[in-house]
Amino acid sequence: MTIVVFATEYDAANVIFSILCRSPSEHLIFPIIVKYKPSNNVSFCLQTQKCKNSKRIDTVFVCHAEKLNLSHYIQTASPIKAEDVANSLNDKETELLYVDMILSQTGKEKEDVEFKYMAYFHKSLIIKYLTGKFLLPTSPFWFLSTYGQTEGLLLLTMYYYLFEEQKSTITTTKNYVQCFTENTGSMVFTYSSMSEFINITLKSKFRKLFADFATYARQKNLRDKEEFKYLDTQINLFRKSSHLTNTFRVHYIYIAYNTALETTKFVNYCNITSYDSNLPIGQQCQRNVHILGNSLHENLLCIMKQYFNADCYFKTYIDIKRLKNPDLNVTEYEYALASKKKTIQALTSEQITRAIAKCNKNGEGLFSPVKPGLQGLLEISASDKYVQIQDKRIYRRQHLHKDYHRPFPVFRVQLLHKNIFCFGNSEDWYENMGFNRILQYLPDEYISDEALTRAIWLQDTHFLCDDFEKQFYTTRHEIFNERIPVTNYIGDLDLPLQDTATITEETFFSMCRLIRLTLINAWKKIFPSIDTHTHPIFFFKTQCDTTNDALDYTEDPTEIKQFCICRKKIGLRISIPLPNGTAIAGGEPLKQLSKILNHVMCLDQELSQILNSLTFPGECFDIGIYHTGHCIRIGYMYKTDMDKGKMLHGRLTPIFIVPEGYRNSCKTFIQMQMDLNNLLHHGTKKAPIEELIYSITDKGCPKENLSFMDLKSRQLWNKVNIATDTLITKYLNTHGFNNNATSADDSLLSFIRLIGWPIIKTQLITHYETRIAQQFSQVTFLKIDSKNLQIKKTQFGRVSDFSCLNRQHRGNRDNVLVYIQLKADGNRLILILWSTCFATKCQSNSKQVHCSIALEQLKN
């Protein structure tokens, strides 16, 4: 059956209704595009609002072909009178289109009545059906804005999209047209009437290409499906074989598709699959199969496989700079933990300022002054400057206390009404924490990590007070000092929890053991001398906050017993001692080390499965704590909550994950975890420091605030472009214009007048009607900013704006603003001509782009 897609210049639903009732008005039916097939009938169709199985048109009435004589109208490109359509209407076929709808809506049985009467008495149903199901455009503008503004683009896109029932969008079909032919014909002006419009669509030379284009487009569609199926397979193969976190998995998918479909690669793919006139129509789109998927492997997957494989990651991406020398002369804290002689001083901020001022005064002429305050105290602690007096060295720090021969720790302690800062080099840590009594009652044999952790009962307290002696052992924080070498890696690890997470004891300890295994393997690659069977990693967990649940708590024996009832996050503190004789200098290597540990935690399959089931893993190690003056809570200490009655809560309690080498002497391991010097950044060690690590770099993402995925995303989205003013200068020089401009404004205006505007003006004269082109015969330019200029037309010495470039409005006043925008695209400029019109039909002052011209690519 021959199919005609048509339009009207009046409300199509009412025009169709009048035809169905055989009482036609004087309106016209405009055949837009026709698909011929020998038949006694002609189907008149409209585009549907929804398409099932890619069927995008449906019939609204059927005519007898012989009575209608459609070929006459097509050959003469003439509209069909509604009366002629009504007279040739095939009532039987047309009735079948509406009868079921009418009967289902009315609930009546079919009556023996002529269709025209049935239609007449159900006008509202038919009008509602037509307006609800079909698109009813009444001007050429809709077709041009939807399918394309050039003759070939319009017709080929419309024919394939409406008639071929293929799973291709309009945008995709337009792309197929551009791949099929470089010449898409002349511009079809939006101001044309419907009669002028069908004169173009029914007489176009592009109608001869319908069959060939449909064949090509189907082959292109199949090739695209095959290409993208292979690309999906390549992306999924790596995704399934790697152990990415959920967040990284999403990032990876976006990066992979954007890498494979990057502009130059996609343009190259389009060129390869473009229509080749040297090949038969049935053998198109068969060159370089799987080019996109293969390019992804070269440009991303091979890099990802190295970065997300632990062995390759450390060999390829991790760069560690070490300084080995037995005479390094750098020292960590000197801090005694079982001393009956207590040298701890407690000062407020004001008292520290006065103490530093006194030190500066006493050392005047001997030592350079330091800033008063906490930073000055940290500098004095780390300073090894001394003066020689009678064969005796007097260090600057001894002005604070005569026994301070080596660096000392500085702590922040929270009291009831204030913070104080404490420093010194000795205390009785074990006695004051009650560890001596705890160790007496520990079992001698190792049973399990869980049993050992349950066996520890720490002395507890709940309230803040102003007694420094008590609070020193409940709310102490170590202040980081990057001038002192780091002997323990202290990691602040927060794992945000999913809403549905249920954390049993078995799950939690399995997670901790896997974290230990992952981190110790990474430690072995950084420090090859360690023994992974004995080297300790100390875990602490922030106690769950049970205050919200205490009143409502009732034990249900059927419920799974949870080890952790935290709802927002699991807070862990992890301490990994560096090998004896080794230290890290400064905070920057620690930030990079935290990023590395973040990454390796995502590489273990078992650990990733647990983390993905409970948490939102990713950048979990906090790198903000490695700045001089920043502090971190020490293991066994409490949080303070001033809003809840000055309560202590969230204590860092020990979680014992005993290495295999200490299973026969678990008490020794517990004593190590109770040793404060294993829990401080700069803790005291037995061996002198002979190796100093001063740089650790992940070459895949050297910036501390960016992950590897973030860096790849930024490289994709923030494509590096040459500055606009630099490109302007290059274009002026390339075209032989001496740029003697004294400012960027002069360069921009010179570029537009000499290079940009002649190109735009030629485009306007070629593709726009005379009414529009003539407005640009005499113009001047006003600079808005470094990338935008406004155009004004000049007449008889007067400057004014333009009349609308899209439509001829009633009145048609000169109130339309026209601009040129410059956009950098790699090594070239794109010129965009756009305007704003206040009329409602022009979207009320919204941006209307008229042309976009890419200038030639500049040579590097």
UniProtKB/Swiss-Prot annotation:
Zinc finger (CHC2-type): 804-842
InterPro entries per record: HSV_PRIM
S-adenosyl-L-methionine as UniProt keyword: no
Gene Ontology cellular component terms for the protein in this record: host cell nucleus
Single GO BP term: DNA replication
Compartment(s): Host nucleus
EC number(s) given by UniProt: 2.7.7.-
Quaternary data: Associates with the helicase and the primase-associated factor to form the helicase-primase factor.
Function: Essential component of the helicase/primase complex. Unwinds the DNA at the replication forks and generates single-stranded DNA for both leading and lagging strand synthesis. The primase initiates primer synthesis and thereby produces large amount of short RNA primers on the lagging strand that the polymerase elongates using dNTPs.
Stored HAMAP family: HSV_PRIM (MF_04011)
Name of the protein: DNA primase
Protein species of origin: Human herpesvirus 6B (strain Z29)
UniProt gene name: U43
